[in-house]
C-alpha cells in the first residue's frame, strides 16, 4: 500500500511528524509521496523526504489556490527542487474553479508553466481538478505526448469525467472521499470502471478523514496509517481482495513515479 498524497508539511503534523510516519510503517504502508503546494511547501516537502530516504518522496509544484504567487523565481525554485532524487513529480498543479482563490486565468497560466516544466524535465505530473474539467483537459491534453505520466489526485468527478480522463491516459487517485456515504455515492459506483493499472490510492492527510471509520480518532485528523481502511472499501466496491489491491496500487505508484520496487 503506497500513499500517493500526504500533506506532511501541514502544521497539523508539526508536533508528531515522526510518529505519523512510524504509524504508517507499522500499518503496512510501503511509501509516502509528500505533496508540495507552493514554492515554500515544496522545499519543505523535499526536505522531509530527504530525511526519510527510500520511504518518502515528494512533489514540487504550485496548487491552483496559490497560482497568483507564480513568478520566474517560483519556476526557478521548482526546477532546482526537481533535480533532487527525492522529487519525483511536478505538482500539485491544475485548476480549481470551485472557490477561485486565484483568478482563473492566473490558474491557467501557472498550470501551463508547470506542464512546460514537467515536459522539459520529463517528469510525471500530480494534478488537481475541481469544477474545471473541460478547461483542465483543454490545457492538459496538448502536453500529454511530452509527459511520462500523470495522475488526477483526489478524483471526485462524474462518470463522464472519469471516462474522459481515462481516455486521455491519466491515472486516477482515490481518497477517503469514496468512504463518504453522502458525498461519495457516485464515486463509489465508478470504482469498478477504473482499470487496475491506473488506480492509485491516497489519504490526502491530514484532510479527508474517511467518514465511515470506526472508531474515529479523537483529533479527527487523517493520517497515512488509515490508508488500509480506504483500500478495504475500494476493494469491496471492486470485488477484489484488499491485499491484492494494495499490492497493485503500490506497483502502479512505483511505475508512475519511477521508484525502486
From Swiss-Prot:
Is Ubl conjugation there in the keyword field?
A: no
Organism, scientific name: Erwinia billingiae (strain Eb661)
**Top EC class, one word:** hydrolase
Q: Quaternary structure per UniProt? A: Monomer.
Which cofactors, by name?
Mg(2+)
What gene name is given for the protein in this entry? tatD
Show the GO cellular component annotation of the record: cytoplasm
For this UniProt record, give its keywords in alphabetical order, as a comma-separated list: Cytoplasm, Exonuclease, Hydrolase, Magnesium, Metal-binding, Nuclease
Location(s) in or outside the cell: Cytoplasm
Q: Does the keyword DNA-binding apply?
A: no
Family assignment? Belongs to the metallo-dependent hydrolases superfamily. TatD-type hydrolase family. TatD subfamily.
Write down what this protein is called: 3'-5' ssDNA/RNA exonuclease TatD
Under CDD domains, the record lists: TatD_DNAse
Question: Where, in this chain's numbering, is a divalent metal cation bound?
Answer: 92, 128, 153
Report the GO molecular function annotations.
3'-5'-RNA exonuclease activity; magnesium ion binding; single-stranded DNA 3'-5' DNA exonuclease activity
In short, the EC number is 3.1.11.-, 3.1.13.-
| Protein role | 3'-5' exonuclease that prefers single-stranded DNA and RNA. May play a role in the H(2)O(2)-induced DNA damage repair.
A Pfam family cross-referenced in the UniProt record is TatD_DNase
Amino acid at each position: 500500500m503506497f500513499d500517493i498524497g500526504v500533506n506532511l508539511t501541514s502544521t497539523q503534523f508539526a508536533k508528531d511528524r515522526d510518529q505519523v510516519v512510524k504509524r504508517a510503517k507499522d500499518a503496512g504502508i510501503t511509501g509516502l509521496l509528500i505533496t508540495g503546494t507552493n514554492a515554500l511547501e515544496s522545499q519543505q516537502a523535499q526536505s522531509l523526504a530527504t530525511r526519510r530516504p527510500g520511504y518518502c518522496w515528494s512533489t514540487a509544484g504550485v496548487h491552483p489556490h496559490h497560482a497568483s504567487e507564480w513568478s520566474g523565481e517560483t519556476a526557478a525554485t521548482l526546477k532546482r527542487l526537481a533535480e533532487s532524487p527525492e522529487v519525483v513529480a511536478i505538482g500539485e498543479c491544475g485548476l480549481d474553479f470551485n472557490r477561485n482563490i486565484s483568478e482563473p486565468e492566473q490558474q491557467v497560466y501557472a498550470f501551463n508553466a508547470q506542464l512546460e516544466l514537467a515536459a522539459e524535465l520529463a517528469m510525471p505530473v500530480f494534478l488537481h481538478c475541481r469544477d474545471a474539467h473541460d478547461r483542465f483537459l483543454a490545457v492538459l491534453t496538448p502536453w500529454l505526448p511530452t509527459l511520462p505520466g500523470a495522475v488526477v489526485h483526489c478524483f471526485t468527478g462524474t462518470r463522464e469525467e472519469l471516462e474522459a480522463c481515462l481516455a486521455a491516459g491519466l491515472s486516477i487517485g482515490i481518497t477517503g472521499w469514496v468512504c463518504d456515504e453522502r458525498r461519495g455515492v457516485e464515486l463509489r459506483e465508478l470504482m469498478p470502471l477504473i482499470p487496475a493499472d491506473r488506480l492509485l490510492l491516497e489519504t490526502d492527510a491530514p484532510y479527508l478523514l474517511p467518514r465511515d471509520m470506526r472508531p474515529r480518532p479523537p483529533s479527527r485528523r487523517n493520517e497515512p496509517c488509515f490508508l488500509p481502511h480506504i483500500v478495504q472499501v475500494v476493494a469491496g466496491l471492486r470485488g477484489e481482495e484488499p491485499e491484492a489491491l494494495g499490492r497493485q496500487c503500490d506497483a502502479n505508484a512505483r511505475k508512475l513515479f519511477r521508484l525502486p520496487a
